[in-house]
């Protein structure tokens, strides 16, 4: 796949016979499929009207249907909230869900039976399924609920009761709950091991009614699944449940298809922007993955109100992707020195100092992309772009730092490597830039918070670094390449490749637990901010679960694109 070739970047390059380390990336698999999407404003407005109408029906039925003669069972209420979230509808009812969960938390925390004019709760009536859903939803939303509530499901020897193995629904719920664990929360580690072993046996029994749902969960638990992708799967599962709410189901289908229409329209605009840049022809050595990049961003924020945030982030991530290929797989060291200085200066007048011409091409497109972002922002919000620019400069400096290691033949220690590769992962830049276009980010408070490298920010970024290196290391080794975190860990600790990979995977598990703990109230930032970083982490399970799905676009990424951006749900 990789080779040393005699090449020049452009036909009119003055520099000839440069030996470049080039990598042959496969061409884009989508062609011009997303270039045009014809939907009229009238059709969109009609779809939006349908969704709004059903939204109010659901709001009244599910969230405001309580009265003195209609006492709601807590377990049933939690099941409804769980369904709303699994169907991808929670963004419509955030305040209602918060109010319901707050009330449920208050009446269940004391672990005593409770009945008032609206709610009925009995600790004695709760089975494993009920307790697991209550635990998962409350912890997911930051309520301080102890995992000790699962102690009652253990026997005298301290192990989970054998009788639970026959409660398949309960075990599946406990399995999902275990992924909300904190660091050193042993009971949830035990729960995960117990449920995984037994659920695998059920998953193999294709005739079991829950086998499909169990297989999905074992492959990717709810905590690590993108909201939209899970909604796509769960709509068909929910429809088969005899007790499903028909209005809620119809609302979920219409909402999914409406958002898909909005996203397809957005992607067509982005695809045309990308095609007009013509970088596929001007810089043919770089990966051409605009659709996959949009999928990445869609995982971070899919809600319609974040269209501007997506538009800004797609331009930043596409520029970073091309830069990554210049620094990692094409540019000479001397060229990289020039490009680094140019980006740090951020001044179009520096373009005349750039050579060969491919650097000029990239630099002009790079600066223009950020100018476009500035124009898209309201005047009073443009100060936020400063943070995006500074984070991009840091990314470029990290790319160059790694190029220096390669040029000098330096093999860094694991700790030294992580200081630089933490930034070169691209995630610090992407996370910071994601907040630039979010209109509910009104001040610089979020950016100042990020500058302190809070725990959730560090955990997410390190996960991205480790997951990338774990799957891309062998491909990168086919050419002269800077050592990965795996290589550096092996050298620093004198362990085998398998031992190093096992340790990094173990750290990823613990970093997920740190992310979970950062949602515990009171939080350092509003949950609307923390959720974006959580979503950045979730996307990694799509991109890197089965290899480097960005560089080598495989079935998992293709299927995800099809599910979210091609195939509507039949009504």
Swiss-Prot record:
<feature type="binding site">
    <location>
        <position position="328"/>
    </location>
    <ligand>
        <name>Mg(2+) 1</name>
    </ligand>
</feature>
<comment type="function">
    <text>Involved in sesquiterpene olefins biosynthesis, constituants of cannabinoids and terpenoids-rich resins. Catalyzes mainly the conversion of (2E)-farnesyl diphosphate to germacrene B, which is spontaneously converted to gamma-elemene as a thermal degradation product.</text>
</comment>
<feature type="binding site">
    <location>
        <position position="328"/>
    </location>
    <ligand>
        <name>Mg(2+) 2</name>
    </ligand>
</feature>
<dbReference type="InterPro" id="IPR044814">
    <property type="entry name" value="Terpene_cyclase_plant_C1"/>
</dbReference>
<feature type="binding site">
    <location>
        <position position="468"/>
    </location>
    <ligand>
        <name>Mg(2+) 3</name>
    </ligand>
</feature>
<feature type="binding site">
    <location>
        <position position="472"/>
    </location>
    <ligand>
        <name>Mg(2+) 3</name>
    </ligand>
</feature>
<dbReference type="InterPro" id="IPR008930">
    <property type="entry name" value="Terpenoid_cyclase/PrenylTrfase"/>
</dbReference>
<feature type="binding site">
    <location>
        <position position="287"/>
    </location>
    <ligand>
        <name>(2E,6E)-farnesyl diphosphate</name>
    </ligand>
</feature>
<feature type="binding site">
    <location>
        <position position="476"/>
    </location>
    <ligand>
        <name>Mg(2+) 3</name>
    </ligand>
</feature>
<feature type="binding site">
    <location>
        <position position="324"/>
    </location>
    <ligand>
        <name>(2E,6E)-farnesyl diphosphate</name>
    </ligand>
</feature>
<comment type="similarity">
    <text>Belongs to the terpene synthase family. Tpsb subfamily.</text>
</comment>
<feature type="binding site">
    <location>
        <position position="468"/>
    </location>
    <ligand>
        <name>(2E,6E)-farnesyl diphosphate</name>
    </ligand>
</feature>
<dbReference type="InterPro" id="IPR036965">
    <property type="entry name" value="Terpene_synth_N_sf"/>
</dbReference>
<dbReference type="GO" id="GO:0000287">
    <property type="term" value="F:magnesium ion binding"/>
</dbReference>
<keyword id="KW-0479">Metal-binding</keyword>
<keyword id="KW-0460">Magnesium</keyword>
<feature type="binding site">
    <location>
        <position position="324"/>
    </location>
    <ligand>
        <name>Mg(2+) 2</name>
    </ligand>
</feature>
<dbReference type="GO" id="GO:0016102">
    <property type="term" value="P:diterpenoid biosynthetic process"/>
</dbReference>
<dbReference type="GO" id="GO:0010333">
    <property type="term" value="F:terpene synthase activity"/>
</dbReference>
<keyword id="KW-0456">Lyase</keyword>
<dbReference type="InterPro" id="IPR008949">
    <property type="entry name" value="Isoprenoid_synthase_dom_sf"/>
</dbReference>
<dbReference type="InterPro" id="IPR005630">
    <property type="entry name" value="Terpene_synthase_metal-bd"/>
</dbReference>
<dbReference type="InterPro" id="IPR034741">
    <property type="entry name" value="Terpene_cyclase-like_1_C"/>
</dbReference>
<dbReference type="InterPro" id="IPR050148">
    <property type="entry name" value="Terpene_synthase-like"/>
</dbReference>
<feature type="binding site">
    <location>
        <position position="328"/>
    </location>
    <ligand>
        <name>(2E,6E)-farnesyl diphosphate</name>
    </ligand>
</feature>
<feature type="short sequence motif" description="DDXXD motif">
    <location>
        <begin position="324"/>
        <end position="328"/>
    </location>
</feature>
<protein>
    <recommendedName>
        <fullName>Germacrene B synthase TPS16CC</fullName>
        <ecNumber>4.2.3.71</ecNumber>
    </recommendedName>
</protein>
<comment type="pathway">
    <text>Secondary metabolite biosynthesis; terpenoid biosynthesis.</text>
</comment>
<feature type="binding site">
    <location>
        <position position="465"/>
    </location>
    <ligand>
        <name>(2E,6E)-farnesyl diphosphate</name>
    </ligand>
</feature>
<dbReference type="Pfam" id="PF01397">
    <property type="entry name" value="Terpene_synth"/>
</dbReference>
<feature type="binding site">
    <location>
        <position position="324"/>
    </location>
    <ligand>
        <name>Mg(2+) 1</name>
    </ligand>
</feature>
<dbReference type="Pfam" id="PF03936">
    <property type="entry name" value="Terpene_synth_C"/>
</dbReference>
<dbReference type="InterPro" id="IPR001906">
    <property type="entry name" value="Terpene_synth_N"/>
</dbReference>
């Amino acid at each position: 796949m990789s080779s040393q070739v005699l090449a020049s970047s452009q036909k009119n390059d003055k520099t000839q016979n440069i030996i470049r380390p080039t990598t042959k990336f496969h061409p884009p698999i989508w062609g011009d499929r997303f270039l045009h999407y014809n939907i009229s404003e009238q059709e969109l407005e009609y779809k939006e009207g349908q969704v709004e109408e059903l939204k109010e029906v659901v709001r009244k039925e599910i969230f405001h249907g309580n009265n003195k003669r209609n006492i709601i069972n807590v377990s049933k209420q939690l099941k409804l909230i769980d369904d709303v979230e699994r169907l991808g509808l929670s963004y419509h009812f955030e305040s209602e869900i918060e109010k319901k969960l707050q009330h449920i938390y208050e009446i269940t925390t004391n672990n005593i039976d409770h009945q008032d004019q609206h709610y009925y709760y009995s600790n004695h009536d709760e089975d494993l399924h009920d307790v697991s859903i209550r635990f998962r939803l409350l912890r997911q939303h930051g309520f301080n609920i102890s995992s000790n509530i699962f102690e009652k499901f253990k026997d005298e020897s301290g192990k989970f009761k054998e009788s639970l193995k026959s409660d398949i629904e309960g075990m599946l719920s406990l399995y999902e709950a275990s992924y909300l664990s904190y660091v050193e929360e042993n009971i949830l580690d035990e729960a995960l091991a117990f449920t995984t072993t037994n659920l695998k046996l059920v998953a193999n029994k294709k005739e079991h009614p829950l086998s499909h749902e169990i297989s999905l969960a074992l492959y990717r638990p709810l905590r690590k699944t993108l909201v939209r992708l899970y909604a796509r799967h769960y709509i068909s599962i929910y429809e088969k449940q005899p007790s499903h709410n028909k209005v809620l189901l119809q609302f979920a289908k219409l909402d999914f298809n409406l958002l898909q229409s909005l996203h397809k329209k957005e992607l067509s605009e982005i695809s045309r922007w990308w095609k007009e840049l013509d970088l596929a022809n001007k810089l043919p050595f770089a990966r051409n993955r605009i659709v996959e990049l949009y999928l990445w961003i869609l995982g971070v924020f899919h809600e319609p109100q974040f269209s501007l945030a997506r538009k800004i982030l797609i331009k930043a991530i596409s520029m970073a992707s091309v830069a990554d290929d210049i620094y990692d797989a094409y540019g000479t060291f001397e060229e990289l020195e020039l490009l680094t200085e140019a980006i740090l200066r951020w001044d179009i007048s520096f373009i005349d100092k750039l050579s060969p011409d491919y650097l000029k091409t990239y630099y002009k497109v790079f600066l223009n992309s950020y100018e476009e972002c500035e124009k898209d922002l309201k005047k009073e919000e443009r100060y936020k772009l400063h943070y995006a620019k500074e984070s991009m400069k840091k990314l470029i400096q990290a790319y160059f730092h790694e190029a220096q290691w390669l040029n000098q033949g330096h093999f860094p220690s694991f700790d030294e490597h992580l200081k630089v590769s933490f930034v070169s992962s691209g995630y610090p830049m992407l996370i910071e830039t994601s907040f630039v276009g979010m209109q509910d980010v009104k001040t610089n408070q979020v950016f100042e918070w990020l500058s302190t490298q809070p725990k959730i920010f560090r955990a997410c970024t390190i996960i991205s670094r480790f997951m990338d290196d774990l799957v891309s290391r062998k491909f990168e080794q086919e050419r002269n390449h800077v050592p990965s975190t795996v290589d550096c860990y092996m050298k620093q600790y004198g362990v085998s490749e398998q031992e190093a990979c096992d340790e990094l995977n173990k750290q990823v598990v613990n970093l997920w637990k740190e992310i979970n703990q950062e949602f515990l109230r009171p939080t350092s930032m509003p949950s609307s901010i923390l959720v974006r970083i959580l979503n950045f982490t979730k996307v990694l399970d799509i991109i890197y679960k089965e290899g480097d799905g960005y560089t080598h676009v495989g079935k998992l990424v293709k299927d995800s694109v099809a599910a979210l951006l091609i195939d509507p749900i039949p009504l």
